[in-house]
Amino acid sequence: MADRNLRDLLAPWVPDAPSRALREMTLDSRVAAAGDLFVAVVGHQADGRRYIPQAIAQGVAAIIAEAKDEATDGEIREMHGVPVIYLSQLNERLSALAGRFYHEPSDNLRLVGVTGTNGKTTTTQLLAQWSQLLGEISAVMGTVGNGLLGKVIPTENTTGSAVDVQHELAGLVDQGATFCAMEVSSHGLVQHRVAALKFAASVFTNLSRDHLDYHGDMEHYEAAKWLLYSEHHCGQAIINADDEVGRRWLAKLPDAVAVSMEDHINPNCHGRWLKATEVNYHDSGATIRFSSSWGDGEIESHLMGAFNVSNLLLALATLLALGYPLADLLKTAARLQPVCGRMEVFTAPGKPTVVVDYAHTPDALEKALQAARLHCAGKLWCVFGCGGDRDKGKRPLMGAIAEEFADVAVVTDDNPRTEEPRAIINDILAGMLDAGHAKVMEGRAEAVTCAVMQAKENDVVLVAGKGHEDYQIVGNQRLDYSDRVTVARLLGVIA
């Protein structure tokens, strides 16, 4: 199928499909070009079948479209000389179609999927860094972007469309990648975007409140994440046993690797396991001692906080389960670097320590504050806000958490989008017992500046919510803004 022929592509579903050479595959009629395959899916916001005439006018070689019903599944028509093949449940089949089109890229590298509410980005980055230190050519796909390590290109979504995912993976294979760590979002799982991928391993970090504007409740959110293990080729399963949901899943996955730093593992009950036996936190990270089915060891980590110890242990267990030698992993562990915008520490002589993190859920904010407290000799400041046009229920929860775990809470804008910024702030303040003690400042840059300039040398300022992002969405505008750049400028250092 090197020439990407329509007949070969559709062989499993439509044996009598016509022969047509295909150049590229796209869901977007606006970029469809001569020789392309246009796939007209019915999406949440638009029906791609409406754009078939536009695609034909632009010279596409063939079209695959959503069938009206089961009776028309496999039907072949011709419009202006262009074959149009109708398939039912096209969204569900799209990952498999794209996989065949791009020559099954997940067969040609070690692909690790990481799902969970928090920790996906750090865990994928650690997996990619560590495997590369052991000789792989490693890549990442997720929130920060897609690409080989050091050459990551920013993306809009954690998990792209089913076609985008297979296309990106194929590009990575073409660049020589032998290992890829991919963030797998709940949206991506529900919408079948990774349905046909063959994961060598699948990692579950944790589950807490997020995306309830989409899933409705925690039960449906958990069910979405569980799809990675119940409906996908998940390979080795690595599960965080410190998470309540993780413990439930371990009971259903007897062959999974259980990982804990809170003594939630009984070695006599789990087939394979890894647990921290002692963790000592210090200014530059933590010293971690652990025992496991593969042996015991000690790691010096440059990452801040308990949840990053958990992320590191999950990455370690995954690589051990995939067959990388423990001795080699221990030799290279000290070379692992913190991830951009994930508990990223900025320091300067005579200035407070500033930590920039992506925490934008109640659980993530609590863990980030607890992590920062471990390294704080003075007062702990928290600068944060909540996104507009998103789950409003988490706003008072995050206000309560900031009030409880920080000494000084500075409430500001995040990405207000089309909501009134002050209304979002008021929702946050409603969760505080004494909102009068919070500092309120709508302009995010001004709020960060206020906190950093007023904090003392022994204080720690956590700037939470945006992490690696270099933009702010106000109304329908995407404005240039970066917490990292703002903090670096205030401290006189390089971001």
Curated annotation (Swiss-Prot):
Subcellular localization(s) per the UniProt record: Cytoplasm
Requisite cofactors: Mg(2+)
Gene, per the UniProt record: murE
GO BP term, example: cell division
PTM comment: Carboxylation is probably crucial for Mg(2+) binding and, consequently, for the gamma-phosphate positioning of ATP.
Organism the protein comes from: Escherichia coli (strain K12)
Modification type N6-carboxylysine: residues: 225
Gene Ontology MF terms in the entry: ATP binding; magnesium ion binding; UDP-N-acetylmuramoylalanyl-D-glutamate-2,6-diaminopimelate ligase activity
Role: Catalyzes the addition of meso-diaminopimelic acid to the nucleotide precursor UDP-N-acetylmuramoyl-L-alanyl-D-glutamate (UMAG) in the biosynthesis of bacterial cell-wall peptidoglycan. Is also able to use many meso-diaminopimelate analogs as substrates, although much less efficiently, but not L-lysine.
The protein's name: UDP-N-acetylmuramoyl-L-alanyl-D-glutamate--2,6-diaminopimelate ligase
Keywords in alphabetical order: ATP-binding, Cell cycle, Cell division, Cell shape, Cell wall biogenesis/degradation, Cytoplasm, Ligase, Magnesium, Nucleotide-binding, Peptidoglycan synthesis
Residues involved in meso-2,6-diaminopimelate binding: 390, 414-417, 465, 469
Superkingdom assignment: Bacteria
Catalytic reaction list: UDP-N-acetyl-alpha-D-muramoyl-L-alanyl-D-glutamate + meso-2,6-diaminopimelate + ATP = UDP-N-acetyl-alpha-D-muramoyl-L-alanyl-gamma-D-glutamyl-meso-2,6-diaminopimelate + ADP + phosphate + H(+)
pH dependence text: Optimum pH is about 8.
Family according to the record: Belongs to the MurCDEF family. MurE subfamily.
